[in-house]
Design a protein with these regions (language model features):
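Glycine-rich and polybasic anion-binding loops at the starts of cofactor/ligand-binding domains
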Residues: 1-128
Length: 128
C-alpha cells in the first residue's frame, strides 16, 4: 500500500490517492474505470500484472477542471514490483503530468508498471 503522506498535494479539485482510499472514498468512479482500457484478460502480460499487482495510484480530474501547474509523481518501483496508475480525466479538463520512475534495488525480479489513462471528450493531457 502507498503511504498517503508520500503523495504530493493534488491541485484543487483533483483526486489523488492510493487504491485502498479510492475503493473506500470513490468506489463507483474507481470501479467504473479500472481495467476499462487494459482488461485483465487482454494479454498474458496484463494478466500477469493484475495477478501480482501490489500498489496503485488513482488520479481523477473532474469535468471542466483546468490544472495550471503540473502534477509531478515520483514512482519508486523498489517499493512494489507491480504497480499501476489509473488516471481519469473528465470532459474538457486539462492536466500536465510529469512522472519519474526509479528503482533503488539491484535484485533481479519480475516487474510491471501500467499507466491506464482515460480521456473523456475534450480532455487534454500532457504526459511527460
Amino acid at each position: 500500500m502507498i503511504d498517503p503522506a508520500d503523495l504530493p498535494n493534488p491541485p484543487e479539485g483533483v483526486i489523488l490517492c492510493d487504491w485502498q482510499t479510492a475503493l473506500e472514498d470513490h468506489s463507483d468512479l474507481f470501479k467504473t474505470h479500472l481495467q476499462s482500457v487494459i482488461p485483465l484478460d487482454q494479454h498474458k502480460v496484463s494478466a500477469h500484472h493484475y495477478r501480482h499487482l501490489d500498489r496503485g495510484l488513482f488520479i481523477y480530474v473532474p469535468d471542466e477542471t483546468q490544472v495550471k501547474d503540473w502534477l509531478e509523481l515520483t514512482i519508486d518501483l523498489s517499493q512494489g514490483a507491480h504497480q499501476q496508475v489509473l488516471l481519469v480525466m473528465g470532459r474538457n479538463s486539462r492536466l500536465t503530468l510529469v512522472e519519474s520512475l526509479y528503482n533503488q534495488t539491484t535484485a533481479r525480479a519480475s516487474q510491471t508498471y501500467l499507466a491506464e489513462i482515460i480521456l473523456e471528450e475534450g480532455a487534454q493531457l500532457d504526459y511527460i
